[in-house]
């Protein structure tokens, strides 16, 4: 597989979709970003691309209800999935969304990898584990980013990373776990390197 290095600073907004069935055709390579409503997903995308307002951040958890697609280069897309697990969303909507999310992860042919973001202080909640299960069952590689790592001391951070790495072993999937902080620039290089690796099959053809 040929090694590539994409310039994520050139990433731009492509389109928004109200649901999984409305996203553009299944071509190129997509990498999806998922996480609980307060996991810092938009902040991570902005840090990766070095753009303050590429993905809109909100003080109100659950604000991102649309699926937002961003283009790194033609045929290379990042997909920002709506935050899950927000209490104020009606139960029926939650159930419907979780069902379509599972479908997307398991049936989308151009999906090359999944980045799951979790607050380092509260990792592996039920829905996080559900996302991991779906991805593993679809043979999809996963990068778990433990966000807000700057909130912990270095030793506490290392302990949490070790704990999560051990906790995910039973899933038996291709799962990498890294600490991440947009504020302190922790893990941004590892995120970019993983995306490069996942995007590379198209370059190798």
UniProtKB/Swiss-Prot annotation:
Binding site for GTP: 35-42, 62-66, 80-83, 147-150, 180-182
GO biological process: division septum assembly
Spans through the membrane: none
Domain EngB-type G: 27-201
GO molecular function: GTP binding; metal ion binding
Keywords noted in UniProt: Cell cycle, Cell division, GTP-binding, Magnesium, Metal-binding, Nucleotide-binding, Septation
Record's GO cellular component terms: cytosol
UniProt cross-references to CDD domains, sorted A to Z: YihA_EngB (cd01876)
UniProt cofactor(s): Mg(2+)
NCBIfam families (UniProt xref): GTPase_YsxC (TIGR03598)
HAMAP family: GTPase_EngB
PANTHER family the record matches: ENGB-TYPE G DOMAIN-CONTAINING PROTEIN, MSS1/TRME-RELATED GTP-BINDING PROTEIN
Record's function text: Necessary for normal cell division and for the maintenance of normal septation.
Stated family: Belongs to the TRAFAC class TrmE-Era-EngA-EngB-Septin-like GTPase superfamily. EngB GTPase family.
Name used for this protein in its record: Probable GTP-binding protein EngB
Organism name: Haemophilus influenzae (strain PittEE)
Organismal lineage: Bacteria, Pseudomonadati, Pseudomonadota, Gammaproteobacteria, Pasteurellales
